[in-house]
Amino acid sequence: MLQKDGDIDEDVSHRIKVGWLKWRQASGVLCDKRVPQKLKGKFYRTAIRPAMLYGAECWPTKRRHVQQLGVAEMRMLRWACGHTRKDRIRNDVIRERVRVAPIEEKLVQHRLRWFGHIQRRPSEAPVHIGRLRRADNVKRGRGRPNLTWEESVKRDLKDWAINKDLALDRGAWKLAIHVPEP
């Protein structure tokens, strides 16, 4: 869901709302103290997180988008464990209890997995047509240019110290971008 200015704010907030809808549908299980926390984490990983990250492969995310997703995730996980922020329990401890990797890392994994699919396709494939490119001789307005998906991928590759040519080898690429659950 692109906005007129090319931003993804509405899409991120919509995905967070969808995650909360899934949460409410399953609140009977997730808020039950008799259900083991490991099982709650597995349910979160299989039902709620995919709903929140649906379509995120194509998002050129900014720090605030990642932060919004992270905040929503931690609120859900804390609630599932029966804790609040007042209990002053660290996020890492909560994540270990329910065995859930940070949504930020999973978001990057999804984006890099999609990048690998694109890299392995021939250059005339339809998937390359949909990529936005900046025109060289077009005058644009003042201010910083909008963040593109390619720039997000470059940043992710640099942060994770992965060479983009590795994407041509499917097995090695899968190992390089894998984010294990704790």
Regions found by a protein language model. Name each.
Residues 1-182:
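Short linear motifs embedded in intrinsically disordered, charge-biased segments
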